[in-house]
Swiss-Prot record:
Record's keyword annotation contains Signal: yes
GO cellular component, as recorded: extracellular region
Modified residues (Asparagine amide): 88
Keywords assigned by UniProt, alphabetized: Amidation, Ion channel impairing toxin, Neurotoxin, Secreted, Signal, Toxin, Voltage-gated sodium channel impairing toxin
Organism: Pogonomyrmex rugosus
Propeptide: 24-61
Protein localization: Secreted
Homology family: Belongs to the formicidae venom clade 1 family.
Tissue-specificity statement: Expressed by the venom gland.
Functional summary from the UniProt entry: Vertebrate-selective toxin that causes pain by targeting voltage-gated sodium channels.
Keyword DNA damage: no
GO molecular function: sodium channel regulator activity; toxin activity
Name of the molecule in the record: Myrmicitoxin(1)-Pr2c
Signal peptide: 1-23
């Protein structure tokens, strides 16, 4: 199977446009060479690290999801029983 040349051109164009966007300091504050001096970037990084640490420290129990999953997985059996006994009865 031959890949069309237009697909190659599209992939290259999208890749170049994405890399140019990331390299522009106005479009991407993380690409700023003085990122350490940027208080917004530092505050964002600290908030992200804190949120990840909290999420990993206190995982939510999976128990509330089990009754919901049991209910959802039983719906096809209930539908089959209703069709068999009430509709086609």
């Amino acid at each position: 199977m031959e890949i069309p040349k237009l697909l190659y051109i599209a992939v290259i164009a999208i890749g170049l446009s994405g890399s140019l966007t990331c390299a522009t300091p106005l479009a991407n504050p993380w690409a700023d060479p003085e990122a350490e001096a940027n208080p917004k970037a530092k505050a964002t990084a600290e908030a992200t690290a804190e949120a990840i640490a909290e999420a990993l420290a206190e995982p939510e129990p999976a128990l509330p999801a089990l009754p919901l999953l049991a209910f959802l997985f039983s719906l096809p059996a209930v539908q089959h029983w209703i069709e068999k006994n009430w509709i086609n009865g």
